[in-house]
Amino acid sequence: MRRYIIASHHKLAYGLKDTVDFLTNGIKKIYDVNAYVEDGEKPIEEVVSELFASFDENDEVLVFADMMGGSVYQKFYPYMSDKVHVVCGINLPLTLALVLESEDTP
C-alpha cells in the first residue's frame, strides 16, 4: 500500500492536506505533520516515529516536505529507503499529481 505524508513547519501541511482532500473527495488517506505549532506539543521526532511504526514494513511511503534540508525534512531523512521517498518543495499541483498517480506506477 502507498502511504502519503505531508510535513511542514507550522500549518502548511494541514492546509495542503485539507485542500487535496477537498479536490479529490478524500479518495486517499493522507497524513499531515505540522511541526512547531504550539509550545508543549509532542516532539516531531516522536510523531514521525509513531507514524512509521503504524505502517506495514512493505508499504511504500511518499513524504512531501516543505523545504529540502529544513528541520522537518531532517526528521524524515533517516527513514529514506527504496520504499520511503521524500519530495521537497511541495505545492498543490505536484502533490495532487503524485497522490492521484496509480499505485502501480513506480
Protein language model features and the residues they cover:
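N-terminal loops that bind phosphate or other acidic moieties
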Residues: M1-P106
